[in-house]
Amino acid sequence: NLVGGLVALFAFMNSSLSGAASRFIAYSIGENRGESKNVFSSLLTIHCIVAFVLVLVCETIGIIFFDRLVIPETRLYAAKIAFHISVAATAISVLRIPYNASIIAHEDMKVFAYVSVAEVLMKLVIVFLLNIIVLDKLIIYSWLYLAVVVIVTLIYSIYCIRSYSDAFALLGFV
């Protein structure tokens, strides 16, 4: 229940942040006053702060929760590793939001669809690999999921930087 609730919370948060970010970018593109680079830079800075606060809160509260959860002693190490990797994957997903929003605002849905299909296929490969691998499946799944999140984030960010002039902004510096 705890994991399911957290997943639902983060899915809602990502969806809300992405919708708001794409509105800001689309509005700045529509205004055509050359402010879209500033808007994207501001969004990237805000999402970096949100990701940092998210990691800080999750890691702090996570320590408290691990003392209260009933986890078999033999699985405690794997559960802690999976938790830390999941926090990192969530933070990277938050950092991806401005790039997703930029693609949506530029109405480049073909790229969004191709990358989404590739992401689902990579996750399917993970499921097949888990049947083959003899190591701790929870730890391996966590690392492979983090790899998928990093790969997809890199694809989105590289595509946006190459395709849109407003996406080449680094944390408040235009």
Q: Model-derived features: where do they sit?
A:
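Helix-loop interface residues and adjacent transmembrane-helix termini in multi-pass membrane transporters
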Residues: 76, 105-106, 135-136
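Membrane-interface junctions at transmembrane-helix termini in multi-pass inner-membrane proteins
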Residues: 91-115, 128-129, 139, 160-164
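Interhelical loop/hinge segments that connect adjacent transmembrane helices in multipass membrane
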Residues: 138-144, 156-174
